[in-house]
């Protein structure tokens, strides 16, 4: 397996891991600040986590591994 491919995968994984931790928590507290309803804050934070997850799935499926392997050679 290519070192370029491994770096790309690890970089993408680290980005989405950080986004999965930071984005929902940030969203929860921002919505909590704007509205006193904890249920709404939790629901929107869950929605934010799903947005990050869908983004990761889309990024993983659109990753062009054939071009990266060809670029290596």
UniProtKB/Swiss-Prot annotation:
Primary location recorded for the protein, binned into one broad class: endoplasmic reticulum
Gene Ontology cellular-component annotations: endoplasmic reticulum membrane; endoplasmic reticulum-Golgi intermediate compartment membrane; ER to Golgi transport vesicle membrane
Domain of life according to the entry: Eukaryota
InterPro entries reported in the protein's UniProt record: Vma21 (IPR019013)
Lumenal topology ranges: 34-37
Keyword check for Transmembrane helix: yes
Compartment list: Endoplasmic reticulum membrane; Endoplasmic reticulum-Golgi intermediate compartment membrane; Cytoplasmic vesicle, COPII-coated vesicle membrane
Signal peptide, first to last residue: none
Keyword presence, Transmembrane helix: yes
Cytoplasmic side: 1-12, 59-73
Motif (Prevents secretion from ER): 70-73
GO terms of biological process kind: vacuolar proton-transporting V-type ATPase complex assembly
Topology in membrane: Multi-pass membrane protein
Keywords: Cytoplasmic vesicle, Endoplasmic reticulum, Membrane, Transmembrane, Transmembrane helix
TM helices/strands, residue ranges: 13-33, 38-58
Family membership: Belongs to the VMA21 family.
HAMAP family: VMA21
Role: Required for the assembly of the V0 complex of the vacuolar ATPase (V-ATPase) in the endoplasmic reticulum.
Protein name: Vacuolar ATPase assembly integral membrane protein VMA21
Lineage: Eukaryota, Fungi, Dikarya, Ascomycota, Saccharomycotina
